[in-house]
């Protein structure tokens, strides 16, 4: 891991409701870049099926990137829950796993940038630099929102002809899409969600905070929420009919709602799962459509080997 975005040339935007953004971003990146990862079934470290030579970039905007994210990365790679790491409440075996994870991360080609006030020029420059020097295949931007640098940049470009938030964010979204295409990288960008969306249980582009113009340019749009009581009631017949989960746990605690899938056959899909926030272990449970009716989807395996993407 070095301090300082499936297919290439795409950009994906995922909206969620708390610091899950950063954890999901790091989990996605480490699944591609870490040479070894903890296997929960085998209870051991295994070689990353995606290979050992992939590289990626994380651009953070609201944390002391290294200090605050380091324990999260240890937890993801080792499978040891982050609270246990921070509280130093570890067994001897868990301590050994943490030490192994630290060594693995030293050999991981994941680069971290911290810029809470980025503009479009910075994104082009930074991502191009890492593409040229480190051949990155994926970028995670955590997260997108209006800031003074973006506003100033847009004002100069438009000669102060009036500045609206939706215009600035639309320009940002268009440029992120162009970056993905021209630099041949997969970009996953995160936003916050609106309070109104939480109250109204919106699970589509209406949940995107800042501007509805943002989803216009993305290839894949996802909203992530913990299921509400009302949603759990809607899927209760499904829960009653299946036997899945961790032990006796069958109730999902996370739902990924796909509100956009450009060029894809499957649209308006909800993936229900169980997410351990301590180490980001995730178990897919089942899928439904927007009417909360269960549907079957054939799995597709995506691998990134030596920065080349294949599917099966």
Specify the residue positions occupied by each region the protein language model found.
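C-terminal regions of RecA-like/P-loop NTPase motor modules
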Residues: 40-47, 51-52, 79, 83-87, ...
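Glycine-rich nucleotide-phosphate-binding loops and adjacent flexible coil segments
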Residues: 2-190, 196-197, 206, 257
């Amino acid at each position: 891991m070095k301090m300082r975005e499936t297919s290439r040339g795409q950009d994906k935007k995922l909206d969620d409701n708390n610091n899950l953004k950063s954890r999901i971003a790091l989990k996605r990146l480490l699944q591609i870049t870490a040479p070894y990862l903890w296997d929960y079934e085998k209870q051991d470290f295994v070689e990353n099926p995606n290979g050992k030579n992939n590289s990626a970039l994380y651009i953070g905007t609201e944390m002391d990137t290294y200090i605050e994210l380091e324990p999260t990365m240890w937890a993801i790679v080792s499978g040891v829950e982050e609270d246990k790491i921070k509280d130093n409440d570890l067994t001897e075996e868990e301590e050994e796993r943490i030490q192994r994870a630290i060594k693995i991360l030293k050999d991981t080609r994941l680069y971290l940038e911290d810029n809470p006030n980025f503009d479009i020029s910075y994104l082009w420059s930074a991502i191009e630099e890492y593409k040229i020097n480190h051949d990155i295949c994926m970028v995670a931007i955590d997260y997108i929102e209006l800031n003074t640098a973006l506003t100033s940049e847009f004002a100069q470009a438009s000669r102060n002809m009036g500045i609206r938030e939706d215009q600035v964010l639309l320009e940002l979204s268009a440029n992120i899409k162009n970056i993905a295409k021209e630099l041949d990288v997969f970009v996953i960008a995160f936003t916050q969600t609106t309070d109104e969306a939480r109250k109204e249980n919106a699970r589509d582009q209406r949940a995107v905070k800042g501007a509805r113009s943002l989803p216009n340019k993305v290839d894949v749009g996802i909203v992530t929420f913990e299921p509400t009581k009302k949603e759990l009631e809607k899927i209760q017949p499904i829960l009653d009919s299946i036997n899945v989960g961790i032990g006796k746990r069958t109730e999902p605690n996370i739902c990924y709602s796909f509100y956009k899938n450009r060029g894809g056959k499957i649209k308006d899909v909800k993936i229900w799962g169980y997410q351990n926030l301590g180490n980001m272990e995730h178990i897919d449970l089942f899928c439904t459509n927007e009417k909360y009716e269960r549907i079957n989807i054939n799995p597709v395996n995506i691998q990134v080997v030596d920065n080349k993407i294949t599917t099966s």
